[in-house]
Amino acid sequence: MNFLAHLHLAHLADSSLSGNLLADFVRGNPTQAYPTDVVDGIFMHRRIDVLTDNLPEVKEAKEWFRPETRRVAPITLDVMWDHFLSRHWAQLSPEMPLPEFVRYAHSQVAMILPDSPPRFVNLNEYLWSERWLERYREMDFIQRVLNGMASRRPRLDALRDSWQDLDTHYDALESRFWQFYPRMMVQAKNKQL
């Protein structure tokens, strides 16, 4: 899962949106550095990552990547799941339109920015102003996201080429998303994540 799905599942679980978004920027045990609700959100994010990576549907999808891009498949898939969530938001979360959810999420996350790591603050400058969460629905934007990550981290250069795998297996990936994501939504609502 990437930013949008983590925020969405956190919202469904009444968990800290801030902690769930911050988690990738926090190493080790966060309990001394953040309030309890943010810490709980960080741990929820970590559980979701482990759960998602071990889902049969996700394991199967990783195998569809070519040998030269399989190493980055987990990252590419995380971004792609956000694409499908953004694209089908109205169907999956009809009670709150995506732009309204994004405004709400931004207001929640903004509260912790003064005490956040610089890399997280930097991400937030672009995430909200450039409307990433809403633009995930556009495949051109997904390609831009993958290229941007590859540019910032040369060891992840294969992300650029992983675009072809997404394009080739788009329909099958969308089908797998529909198999597991609604299930995760139920787990979130039942506080099982």
Swiss-Prot record:
<protein>
    <recommendedName>
        <fullName>Acyl carrier protein phosphodiesterase</fullName>
        <ecNumber>3.1.4.14</ecNumber>
    </recommendedName>
</protein>
<dbReference type="InterPro" id="IPR023491">
    <property type="entry name" value="ACP_phosphodiesterase_gpbac"/>
</dbReference>
<dbReference type="GO" id="GO:0008770">
    <property type="term" value="F:[acyl-carrier-protein] phosphodiesterase activity"/>
</dbReference>
<keyword id="KW-0443">Lipid metabolism</keyword>
<dbReference type="Pfam" id="PF04336">
    <property type="entry name" value="ACP_PD"/>
</dbReference>
<keyword id="KW-0276">Fatty acid metabolism</keyword>
<comment type="function">
    <text>Converts holo-ACP to apo-ACP by hydrolytic cleavage of the phosphopantetheine prosthetic group from ACP.</text>
</comment>
<keyword id="KW-0275">Fatty acid biosynthesis</keyword>
<keyword id="KW-0444">Lipid biosynthesis</keyword>
<dbReference type="GO" id="GO:0006633">
    <property type="term" value="P:fatty acid biosynthetic process"/>
</dbReference>
<dbReference type="InterPro" id="IPR007431">
    <property type="entry name" value="ACP_PD"/>
</dbReference>
<comment type="similarity">
    <text>Belongs to the AcpH family.</text>
</comment>
<keyword id="KW-0378">Hydrolase</keyword>
